[in-house]
Amino acid sequence: MDPLEASRLVTDEYSAKILVATFKKPKSAIDLSREYGIPIAACYRRIHALEHAGLIRCTERALTQKGKRISLYMSQLKNAYIFFENGRLRVRFQLATGITRDFGGDWKAVDVLEPSFPTQ
């Protein structure tokens, strides 16, 4: 994952809500969707992306009152830092496990398109 993608992942509105909501207590996608107004399909997409990045994980599987098995997710992200210095972007995730993941480790430049302004 490049630093721009990593920064987008944690600053996305739905992803941020999911990470904050699951920081202390595991929650299901249904609970997250209902409590935070996240459309259920978007909630599952963000959970999948966060899980793929190692920022959230399924901590248990539970049965609903109707006997359906659901997954409960818990945030693994302890700290997230986004650095912008001298035109370079770097992102650091510190996980609950003690692992630190750096993106753009050598202050790698990110290609950003220059905005084009209409001329009059």
Which role fits each region the language model picked out?
Residues 2-38:
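N-terminal helix-turn-helix DNA-binding core of bacterial DNA-binding proteins
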Residues 3-12, 28, 59-84:
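Short, cationic-aromatic polyanion-contact patches
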Residues 34, 51-52:
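Alpha-helical residues within the helix-turn-helix
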Residues 77-120:
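Amphipathic alpha-helical dimerization/coiled-coil segments
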